[in-house]
Amino acid sequence: MFAKINHLAICTTNYAANARFYQALFGMKASNTQRPARAAPVGDGQVGLNNIPLRDGRRSGLDHFGFEVESIPLALERMKKFDPNLPAVQRPAVRPNAAWSAADHDMIIYDLAERDSGKAQDIFAENTGGELPRRYINHIALRATNPERSAEFYSTVYELPISNDRSGGSYRLSDGRVTLLILPWKMENFVGHDPEPPRLEHFGFKVESIEAVKRDLEEIAGTNPVMVTKPLGLGAEGKARLAVLKQCPIGQLQLTDLEGVHIDVNDH
């Protein structure tokens, strides 16, 4: 395929512990090249999940995602043809895993890396696909003001086919392994809790068993009190936030990581 989703980034003060959480619960792998003072990336064979130290003035939580593409010049050409006003900037050479950063019409940020460029480092060079692991990232979810236009954009520019499944008013596009789920952004979703702009909302894992994940989550928290996730659905606002997360037609069990990033899992 022309493009595949290869990158997610979380900004967190607990970047090292958060990376260990994803290793412990979901079996993600750390890079063979460790850089203790830098971000802590882990991978599932395709997606590199980068846990980034939170800097001043930056918002914590799920930050952006990224594509690996056959040709960055062609992707940029298609993007400008689709909408000349869409922004894209070339990144400094010190960030080899994200040659360019761009945004869709809702200003949802994503990175671009070119396949076989020889520039990938750390987990992004070590993610080589192969046999599906027992637990792996199988969808990322965006909230968009115009889901149909967003789906058209990602399909036209990145050749992600659009599924006929429109459950929950969503659009599903796939690179063959990871689904890009585009959900409608509605102000009505925020009547009971603080409003959020259109954004990268959550991501989810395909697992072998929901019950096994529940058992592992309890065992991990009992073994290591640092790895206790944020509570979901507590209080009126918590219930309202959880109700929005449950609008995802793929997720069956909802939880968070140590930073409070929303995750869901499915075994169907």
PLM regions with names:
Residues 1-19, 62-65, 115-151, 179, ...:
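N-terminal beta-strand motif that seeds the catalytic metal site of vicinal oxygen chelate
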Residues 4-13, 41, 55-133, 172, 218-268, ...:
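Vicinal oxygen chelate
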Residues 15, 35, 94-95, 147, ...:
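Short strand-connecting beta-turns/loops that link adjacent beta-strands
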Residues 18-23, 79, 107, 150-155, ...:
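Conserved active-site tyrosine of GNAT-family acetyltransferases
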Residues 24-31, 83-86, 156-163, 221-224:
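Conserved acetyl-CoA-binding loop of GNAT-fold acetyltransferases
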Residues 26-61, 102, 109-117, 161-197, ...:
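Conserved short beta-strand elements that form part of the metal-binding/catalytic scaffold
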